[in-house]
Structure formats: structure tokens, C-alpha cells
């Protein structure tokens, strides 16, 4: 009896020892694997999300991301066609932009604030938080947000309108990035933000004069930085010309980005809500507009809405209008003749053929752009 008890105890000890050795072995292998992973470039793996319409990519495809990847940044003053631009690019099977992150322009503005304050700069340097440390942290943060707020794709883009206020800084952080600066007649942009009640930090929506002054300041900042990085990195895209002649401009734009042409960019409205297509936010103000095909319905809505005294002083209030090619005294201006297909799209839009789908409907939107 005692012998049998000893035998059972010995067997139990042997089992416990075996389990312990197995567990320690597994734990050691996991630690080794994690160390190896940390030594490799950051990767995003999501087998389901890598399957995109029109892409011949296996479900286990891995996309690597790093500071030298060819990121695309879309920006401009809000209500200048940035959402339409990103929706058209999102329709391309190789490109993913996604909704506005909202955090990217805020963190960039914070970095600018630190840089402008000489006192803060000294304090940061004394603490060892040098420009190199901050730049490295900014690269990692921005990449993490851009990559992980949507599905993987060969080309990733970000659309946060005011991010391009830091265009030259972004160009330094990401040397292979390209920038699309959306430009629109400031009178149309301002009328859109006022009539649609799009709150923008610093803009007084009760005053056309104030909003046009702020529009001029914002677009001048972004335009100057676009010119500074040069035409090989930054492309001006006039909203009016994009909607009048979308194929011509999208071909030029994709050539600038070194991305193969795909006809789907001309039919973004057909890709909304589809896997690998165009993902829209329920709370962005432009959502109810980009569900429609490209049309010219919004080009001259501002005509007759701006106070006479503001119209009279337009060239002084907003000198960037003339610099960008707009006649400050033309009411309405002649933006050009649309392609036949765009005329047909506009007719269908006016008939009410395109309505907001149920999955995008929500409470009244209260968006603030910073």
C-alpha cells in the first residue's frame, strides 16, 4: 500500500515537472518571438482587411509601413472639396484614405506651438526632449493613426484639411510623401461653411468679411508651403476644374502620385459602403454631398449671398483669390464648361436620384474643424 502511494506520488511529480518544463519552454519561445518582432519594421497584419475589390492580393498579404513610404496628404481650407478628393481616391482599389482623423492637425498644431515658443524650446532641450526626439515620436504617432484607423492598402492617404498648415514639417518627416492642396473660390468655401453651419475654430460664422479674411490667411499659409516643397511633391487641385473635368484631372493627379490609372475613381458613388471602397462618416458635413456623383451643383451657390460692402472690398479682403486665378469682382465668375457626363450627373442630382442611405443617417451633425 505504501509502495503504491509512493508510486502515485512519483507519477504526480513527474507530470507536474513535465507540465512546468513545457510551460517554461513555451514562455521562452514566446519571449524570443516578441524580441524578434520588436527588431523588425512595424507591420500591419489583418488578413480579412487586405482583401480589396480589384486587388489580386492573397488574404495573408502583409503591408509594411515606415517613414519612407509614399504617403498621400490631402488638405486645404474646409469646404474646398477635400472630402470629394479623398472619396475619389478611396474608390481606387490600391488606395485607402478613410475619414478625417481629427487628431492629426491637433497634434501638429501642438508641435508648432512648442517650436514657436523660445522658452518652451529651451525647457524641452534641457529635459532632453530635442527636435530629433520629438520628430521621431511624431513620425511614429502619425503613422500609427494613419495606418490603423482603416484597412491596409498599397497606398495610404490622410485627409485632415488643416494638416497642411504643417506641410513643410510633414514633408520633412515623410520624405517620400506627396501633398494634394485643394483650392476653391474662397467666396464659395465661405458661403458653404456659413450656410451649412460648419464651425471652424477662429471663424466667425456671422460675418462673411471675417470668414473671408481667415480663409485668405489659411490658404496663403498652405499655398506658400506647397510652393516651398515644390511641384514634384505638392500639387494644387482646383475644385472647380476637378468637378468640370474629372477624368482629365484624375489622370493628371494619379500620374503625379505614380499610381496606375483606374476608372473607378470616376464613379466613387458606386463604391460607398463596399468592402475596399469608400468609407464615410455619419458625422462629417460633406457626407450627404459625396454620396452623389461628381456634379457642378455647388459651383455658384454663393452668388447673390455675400453682402455688397464685402463684395466691393473683395480684392483687399481676400487677395489670394487673384493669386489662385479667381476674378475677385466676377459675380458669377466663368469657371468653364463641364464635360457632357458631368452635365448628365448634375441633371440626375437635381432630380433627387441620390439620397443618403439609411446606414449613414444619424442625428443632426455638429461638426467642428480645428
Curated annotation (Swiss-Prot):
Active site annotation, chain numbering: 100 (proton donor/acceptor)
Location, primary (coarse class): Golgi
E.C. number(s) listed in UniProt: 2.8.2.20
Residues bearing attached sugar chains per UniProt: 60, 262
PANTHER family: PROTEIN-TYROSINE SULFOTRANSFERASE 1, PROTEIN-TYROSINE SULFOTRANSFERASE 2
Cytoplasmic side: 1-8
Family the entry assigns: Belongs to the protein sulfotransferase family.
Name by which UniProt lists this protein: Protein-tyrosine sulfotransferase 1
Site for Transition state stabilizer, residues: 159, 286
Superkingdom to which the source organism belongs: Eukaryota
Sorted UniProt keywords: Disulfide bond, Glycoprotein, Golgi apparatus, Membrane, Signal-anchor, Transferase, Transmembrane, Transmembrane helix
Keyword Membrane attached: yes
Disulfide bonds: 97-157, 226-234
GO biological process entries: post-translational protein modification
GO molecular function: protein homodimerization activity; protein-tyrosine sulfotransferase activity
Location in the cell: Golgi apparatus membrane
Ranges in the topological domain labelled Lumenal: 26-370
GO CC terms of this entry: Golgi apparatus; Golgi lumen; Golgi membrane; trans-Golgi network
Catalyzed reaction equations: L-tyrosyl-[protein] + 3'-phosphoadenylyl sulfate = O-sulfo-L-tyrosine-[protein] + adenosine 3',5'-bisphosphate + H(+)
Amino acid at each position: 500500500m505504501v509502495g503504491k502511494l509512493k508510486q502515485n506520488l512519483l507519477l504526480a511529480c513527474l507530470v507536474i515537472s513535465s507540465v512546468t518544463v513545457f510551460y517554461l519552454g513555451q514562455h521562452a519561445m514566446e519571449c524570443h518571438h516578441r524580441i524578434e518582432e520588436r527588431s523588425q519594421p512595424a507591420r500591419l497584419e489583418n488578413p480579412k482587411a487586405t482583401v480589396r475589390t480589384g486587388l489580386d492580393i492573397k488574404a495573408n498579404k502583409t503591408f509594411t509601413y515606415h517613414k519612407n513610404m509614399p504617403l498621400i496628404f490631402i488638405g486645404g481650407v474646409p469646404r474646398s472639396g477635400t472630402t470629394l478628393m479623398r472619396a475619389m481616391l478611396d474608390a481606387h482599389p490600391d488606395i485607402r484614405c478613410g475619414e478625417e482623423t481629427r487628431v492629426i492637425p491637433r497634434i501638429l498644431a501642438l508641435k508648432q506651438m512648442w517650436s514657436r515658443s523660445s522658452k518652451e524650446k529651451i525647457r524641452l532641450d534641457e529635459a532632453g526632449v530635442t527636435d530629433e526626439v520629438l520628430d521621431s515620436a511624431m513620425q511614429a504617432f502619425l503613422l500609427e493613426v494613419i495606418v490603423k484607423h482603416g484597412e491596409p492598402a498599397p497606398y495610404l492617404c490622410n485627409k485632415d484639411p488643416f494638416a497642411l498648415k504643417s506641410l513643410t514639417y510633414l514633408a520633412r518627416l515623410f520624405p517620400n510623401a506627396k501633398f494634394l492642396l485643394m483650392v476653391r473660390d474662397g467666396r464659395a468655401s465661405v458661403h458653404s461653411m456659413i450656410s451649412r453651419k460648419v464651425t471652424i475654430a477662429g471663424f466667425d460664422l456671422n460675418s462673411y468679411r471675417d470668414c473671408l479674411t481667415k480663409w485668405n490667411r489659411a490658404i496663403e499659409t498652405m499655398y506658400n508651403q506647397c510652393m516651398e516643397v515644390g511641384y514634384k511633391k505638392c500639387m494644387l487641385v482646383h475644385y472647380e476644374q476637378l468637378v468640370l473635368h474629372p477624368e482629365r484631372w484624375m489622370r493628371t493627379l494619379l500620374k503625379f502620385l505614380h499610381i496606375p490609372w483606374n476608372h473607378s475613381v470616376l464613379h466613387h458613388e458606386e463604391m460607398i459602403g463596399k468592402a475596399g471602397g469608400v468609407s464615410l462618416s455619419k458625422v462629417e458635413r460633406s457626407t450627404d454631398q459625396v454620396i452623389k456623383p461628381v456634379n457642378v451643383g455647388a459651383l455658384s451657390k454663393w452668388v447673390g449671398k455675400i453682402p455688397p460692402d464685402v463684395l466691393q472690398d473683395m480684392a483687399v479682403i481676400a487677395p489670394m483669390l487673384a493669386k489662385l486665378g479667381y476674378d475677385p469682382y466676377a459675380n458669377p465668375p466663368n469657371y468653364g464648361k463641364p464635360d457632357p457626363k458631368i452635365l448628365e450627373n448634375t441633371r440626375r442630382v437635381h432630380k433627387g436620384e441620390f439620397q443618403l442611405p439609411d446606414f449613414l443617417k444619424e442625428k443632426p451633425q455638429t461638426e467642428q474643424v480645428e
